């Protein structure tokens, strides 16, 4: 069992009572998915608001936005769990979840890029945009590969890691907004830079994985 599976099982043990309660009162996976998406839209709006109207409290707003993203990530875990335990899994539900996940990331990174641009952190905004590109490509390569019949889950920087790094970066940027030893914006940018680098590495690693699998399959068919 790798670290991701271990943490997932640990979190499931904690939230399972809540999951069973949701199933009992009739909450559907799609409702949970939609709620998580709305929370990410709220977080994106908070980044935009911090850029326009935040003033001296803008970093505090960033911190709250990070907390909202982290909370929304919990819904991202619960929808699939409710679907499985409640026997409500469906192909449309899987599609709906995947589509709203992509919209959620787009909205979140749009908010971050907007904030950084408005605050004249131009280089930081580019890094955030590169992180967005990598995040989308990780998901796209997997979806395209699975459409070709290839399982493609390799790589480190998957969605849970991206959500945790982005949300905690924003959260702690707000918590330590009054630090004077360095620009507190670095607290957000270090994890975003990690996402930017490793998400794109993961995307290319998945392309390489698909190439190896396809090449091996072609040799078998010869």
Curated annotation (Swiss-Prot):
Pathway recorded for this protein: Phospholipid metabolism; phosphatidylinositol phosphate biosynthesis
Reactions performed catalytically: a CDP-1,2-diacyl-sn-glycerol + 1D-myo-inositol 3-phosphate = a 1,2-diacyl-sn-glycero-3-phospho-(1D-myo-inositol-3-phosphate) + CMP + H(+); 1,2-di-(9Z-octadecenoyl)-sn-glycero-3-cytidine-5'-diphosphate + 1D-myo-inositol 3-phosphate = 1,2-di-(9Z-octadecenoyl)-sn-glycero-3-phospho-(1D-myo-inositol-3-phosphate) + CMP + H(+)
Keyword Transmembrane helix: yes
Cofactor field: Mg(2+)
Record keywords: Lipid biosynthesis, Lipid metabolism, Magnesium, Membrane, Metal-binding, Phospholipid biosynthesis, Phospholipid metabolism, Transferase, Transmembrane, Transmembrane helix
InterPro entries registered for this protein in UniProt: CDP-OH_P_trans (IPR000462), CDP-OH_PTrfase_TM_dom (IPR043130), CDP_ALCOHOL_P_TRANSF_CS (IPR048254)
Record has Transmembrane helix as a keyword: yes
Lineage top rank: taxon: Bacteria
One Gene Ontology molecular-function label: phosphotransferase activity, for other substituted phosphate groups
Cofactor, how bound (note): Contains a di-nuclear catalytic Mg(2+) center.
Enzyme class, first EC level, given as a word: transferase
GO cellular component, one term: membrane
Protein name (Swiss-Prot/TrEMBL): Phosphatidylinositol phosphate synthase
Origin species: Bacteroides thetaiotaomicron (strain ATCC 29148 / DSM 2079 / JCM 5827 / CCUG 10774 / NCTC 10582 / VPI-5482 / E50)
Stored Pfam families: CDP-OH_P_transf
Signal peptide per UniProt: none
PROSITE patterns from the UniProt entry: CDP_ALCOHOL_P_TRANSF
Effect of disrupting the coding gene: Inositol phosphoceramide (IPC) and phosphatidylinositol (PI) is absent and ceramide levels are increased. Results in a mild growth defect. Does not appear to affect production of outer membrane vesicles (OMVs) or OMV cargo selection.
Gene Ontology BP term (one): phospholipid biosynthetic process
Entry EC number(s): 2.7.8.-
Family: Belongs to the CDP-alcohol phosphatidyltransferase class-I family.
Entry's transmembrane regions: 32-52, 58-78, 99-117, 121-141, 163-183, 185-205
Function: Catalyzes the conjugation of the 1'-hydroxyl group of D-myo-inositol-3-phosphate (also named L-myo-inositol-1-phosphate) with a lipid tail of cytidine diphosphate diacylglycerol (CDP-DAG), forming phosphatidylinositol phosphate (PIP) and CMP. PIP is a precursor of phosphatidylinositol (PI).
Record-listed Mg(2+) 1 binding positions: 76, 79, 97
Topology term for the membrane: Multi-pass membrane protein
Protein's cellular compartments: Membrane
